[in-house]
Amino acid sequence: VGGYNIDSLVPDAMALRPDGKAGDGINLAHLLVGSEGTLAYSTAITLKLSPLPARKVMGLCHFPTFYKAMDAAQHLVTLDPVAVELIDSTMLDLARSISIFRPTVETYIKGEPAAILVVEFAEEDPAENTRRLAALETMVADLGFSWDKPSAFTGGTVILTEDDDQARISEMRKSGLNIMMSMKTAAKP
């Protein structure tokens, strides 16, 4: 949700709860979700913390169009990753033009994808991470995105298991806003 989720206040929001029972009012949490802390303040918060995973692995799923990446996302989330994040062609082009990120793009990005979905798994058991990455590769190929196909660009998955490799992609992705703001033109995406 981006911005104020005013739609959560309409009567439809009161119709059914997630468990299918009749609603008993409006859940204000839905209104607050996009407000970036501008609609309320908290005097006490209870968090459920989980330990950091011992190992993370990452798959960079390359797609020839933005829309094909978005369509594939609904399938990829069924693998239960800890994160699925988009890096689009605008971000990739800007990263190529910035000297600190150019080597990252040249090393890990194959061809000229229109979109990359960064899929992360973080299981305690390294064998389970390996199994999940294999399932990711298979799913992406089954969806029709494999470099083994004869067309000019069909996509595929680059696997990253080393912490340093993943950190380079994460740094590029997390710096996305700064990269976008570094554009020299008045028209920013």
Over which residues does each language-model region extend?
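Noncatalytic alpha-helical scaffold of FAD-dependent oxidoreductases
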Residues: V1-P189
